[in-house]
């Protein structure tokens, strides 16, 4: 599985067209994604969310607003439609074009929080809105959708002359801040949803299915009816695992849906997989280790610790070097050049059977240079404001052709080799120590194999020096492979990888 995160608002934006649209995902774009080796497209920012035109600026981050401050779970964001009255039809058409090309479609599901000014225009008439039937006079009730600070008004951390925002009583903020006075670093533009846990004492009230559970099941069923193939679940770990056990079971009775959890607590991995998630973010182990190796000169041998720490869950982890939350590889805040990320990307693509994700513009070395509104100059493509990606502009793509070809060759290689798609993994680092004719400081070697294919993969993380190494294949591996040479000489150029059939 190769996922392409496509942030619709930014993907089709240009210097003259401030906001991209669903219609920008045209036949030519779809063809390019297929040729790139993509299997799934994660359409980001499609659900209606806060923006400066429709919501109070005091509870809106940036001009375009955060795509994770949802104002209507049942609507498409009008910004990304060429004909706003036909926005759902435009979404359905985009999904149809992707499906016609054999691509699967993933969208965000944001279950932990919603925008302070949430009001559904498009929900089923029979269903009460979130908070509509709440008792706002109590801090917690399992029948409420929100948490409240009874008798206390909301005090926002920002102000603007002549602009006022009134909320009484104050609701808890999305990042579990149960206070009427969230800080500027809190998710003050959002409200925490109540799944039946009283955070004052941690008690769980699940004997009767909480109202929020039922509302969220209906939201998911609605988008399944629009033929989406999966959900990337925002901050899944902030919603109780008991809900996921219940809702995913209900969903999968009717749909073959893929569920991907954004999760950052390794001790919770297995319970969320047991609850029905198909894949989990591998930020804490994989991404953080590779970032540390690049920034601080850590040894490539540390990569072994990644899969060991997962205790057999390696193939369930979604690997990435970029997404909307992370600093761009090519940014001066990180690697400074997309090419410096090539060996790290090769590892992400080839190490396991699990899914791989790239972020729009990554395949052209997008740098995200300069300040962009709310998020400032942080090396990320802003999710809060109207920006465009220079590298993705047609007139500039030729300048980044070598980067694009690297990604295309890597992703198509991943998809076309059974040993990579579904084969087993054997780490060779234990058999190639420091004192041998090997360099575990900069070189990582492993085998991917299946019945009909055996591949030795050697990656050189040194960006300056050629590595001429002798890779020992231990007797144990030779037996697993059904016989092969006990040693291979491999020469790998700086920042590259080499695949040897053995």
At which residue positions do the language-model features occur?
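Carbohydrate-binding surface patches
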Residues: 432-474
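The substrate-binding groove and active-site-proximal loops of carbohydrate-active enzymes
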Residues: 7-23, 69-88, 189-212, 229-238, ...
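Active-site-proximal helices and loops of the catalytic beta/alpha 8
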Residues: 148, 154, 218-317, 365-413, ...
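C-terminal beta-strand-rich structural cap/linker in extracellular carbohydrate-active enzymes
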Residues: 486-502
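N-terminal structural segment of carbohydrate-active enzymes
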Residues: 1-104, 112-114, 119-123, 127-135, ...
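Glycan-processing catalytic domains of CAZymes
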Residues: 22-37, 47, 56, 63, ...
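Aromatic- and acidic-residue-enriched segments that line the glycan-binding/catalytic groove
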Residues: 51-70, 111-185, 274-282, 371-383
């Amino acid at each position: 599985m190769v996922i392409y995160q496509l942030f619709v608002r930014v993907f089709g934006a240009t210097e003259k067209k401030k906001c991209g649209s669903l219609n920008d995902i045209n036949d030519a774009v779809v063809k390019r994604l297929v040729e790139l080796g993509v299997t799934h497209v994660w359409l980001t920012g499609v659900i209606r969310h806060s923006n400066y035109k429709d919501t109070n600026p005091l509870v809106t981050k940036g001009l375009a607003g955060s795509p994770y401050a949802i104002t209507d779970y049942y609507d498409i964001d009008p910004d990304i439609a060429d004909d706003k009255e036909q926005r759902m039809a435009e979404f359905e058409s985009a999904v149809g074009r992707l499906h016609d090309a054999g691509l699967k479609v993933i969208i965000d599901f944001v279950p932990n929080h919603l925008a302070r000014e949430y009001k559904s225009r498009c929900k089923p008439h029979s269903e009460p809105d979130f908070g509509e039937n709440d008792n706002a006079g109590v801090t917690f009730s399992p029948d409420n959708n929100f948490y409240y600070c009874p008798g206390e008004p909301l005090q926002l951390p920002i102000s603007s002359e002549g602009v006022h925002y009134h909320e009484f009583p104050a609701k808890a903020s999305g990042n579990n801040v149960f206070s009427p006075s969230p800080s500027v670093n809190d998710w003050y533009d959002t409200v925490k949803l109540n799944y039946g846990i009283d955070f004052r004492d941690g008690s769980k009230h699940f004997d009767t299915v909480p109202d929020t559970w039922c509302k969220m099941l209906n939201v998911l069923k609605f988008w399944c009816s629009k033929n989406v193939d999966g959900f990337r679940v925002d901050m899944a770990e902030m919603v109780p695992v008991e809900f996921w056990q219940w809702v995913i079971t209900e969903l999968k009775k009717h749909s073959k849906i893929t569920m991907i959890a954004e999760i950052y607590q390794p001790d919770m991995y297995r319970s969320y997989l047991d609850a029905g998630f198909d894949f989990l973010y591998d930020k804490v182990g994989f991404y953080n280790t590779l970032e540390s190796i690049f920034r601080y000169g850590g040894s490539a041998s540390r990569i072994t610790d990644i899969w060991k720490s997962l205790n057999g869950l390696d193939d369930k982890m979604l690997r990435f070097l970029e997404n909307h939350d992370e600093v761009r590889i090519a940014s001066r805040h990180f690697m400074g050049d997309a090419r410096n990320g090539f060996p790290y990307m090769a590892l992400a693509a080839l190490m396991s059977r699990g899914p791989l994700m790239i972020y729009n513009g990554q395949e052209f070395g997008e740098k995200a240079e300069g300040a962009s509104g709310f998020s400032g100059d942080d090396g990320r493509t802003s999710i809060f404001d109207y920006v465009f990606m220079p590298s993705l502009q047609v007139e500039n793509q030729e300048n980044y052709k070598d980067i694009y070809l690297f990604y295309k060759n890597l992703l198509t290689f991943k998809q076309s080799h059974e040993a990579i798609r579904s084969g087993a993994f054997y780490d060779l680092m234990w058999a190639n120590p420091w004192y041998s004719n090997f360099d575990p400081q900069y070189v990582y070697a492993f085998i991917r194999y299946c019945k009909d294919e055996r591949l030795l993969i050697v990656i050189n993380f040194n960006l300056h020096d050629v590595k001429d190494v002798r890779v020992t294949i231990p007797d144990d591996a030779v037996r697993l492979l059904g016989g092969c040479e006990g040693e291979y000489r491999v020469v790998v150029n700086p920042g590259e990888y080499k695949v040897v059939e053995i």
